[in-house]
């Protein structure tokens, strides 16, 4: 029998509302007909990203458009945006809220501190650094050839936004936080032997020209790098534009720039005046001579961190997390030339437990510890931690490094 009645719906359609936790929605309510779709413009708040943690109505997200399809009844829906993972650089600035003025560099700075960053300038850009006995500049990043986790201390940020790290071995309590011992150069009787790389001998001008020869210590560092960080595919996380300064400037062919700044004037700098002394892996910011983006800490960086020429200074670069020497009794090399005199080339070093954090110099043929320095790219993200020894910052591993 054919039905003799029909039902007519005079309603205005189905009401669909949407709320967003950690973001905004526009409009908040839409009315649609049977079987139609409702689309909303959604925007995450700062610190959150266009990915959903909760999605009560099963809608789809494409860019900033959230769509609920095939609507057959009224709905009240909600979504929650995921927290975005901050870069290590951004996390540092968020966590370290104290910005004291370092002031004079004429005395050591060894006091304990947390949540503290000091500011300076590199190439006209504000950079941030740790000083004194900072307790919260620990990073866990990478593994060595034996698959052991590697630990580092944050030295500072760089003008390219990368974060500079000092090697601390395979634990925060390490007393052997160096990759081995080495001479800086195997010969000492030429001014060129203060160079990390050089062309020929006889003068600094010669050393700076056609720099194809590696120092002894650079060979040690590069070999370690290829066997460990490169072999484990960590190169993609490292800045190629960060500058490692082997400052060979000299006005008298005796004392080099860092010696004058730190001994006479007490005025450290992060700037590197001469392009040939700016060791980089990318030629856009320096000499582009490094095959691998890794080198050493500078004497100026030690001064910023609390050190003082020819003084003990047990600061963060000296200590491990157990408040002992991170290198035991072993002194360790810096990248900065000190002086050339009496037929002997000298480079800066830092003292071990017998001379805690003592900033001094050594003949380049001396045997001292090698503590590599790397810089994590500005886009590298942290996956957790607060920088303490018990919860070091960890790095989010990705396909591209960012």
Question: Where do the language-model regions lie?
Answer:
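Long, domain-scale functional regions
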Residues: 2-11, 83-402
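Short proline/glycine-enriched turn/loop motifs at strand-loop junctions of beta-rich domains
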Residues: 13, 21-22, 45-50
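Well-ordered beta-strand positions in beta-sheet-rich domains
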Residues: 29, 65, 76-78, 151, ...
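Small-residue (G/S/T/A) turn/hinge positions that recur once per unit in extracellular repeat modules
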Residues: 21-26, 30, 56-59
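Surface-exposed interfaces of beta-sheet-rich extracellular modules
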Residues: 1, 36-67
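Conserved "repeat-terminator" motif of extracellular CCP/Sushi domains
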Residues: 1-16, 64-84
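Surface-exposed coil/turn segments at beta-strand junctions on protein surfaces, enriched
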Residues: 11, 33-35, 45, 61, ...
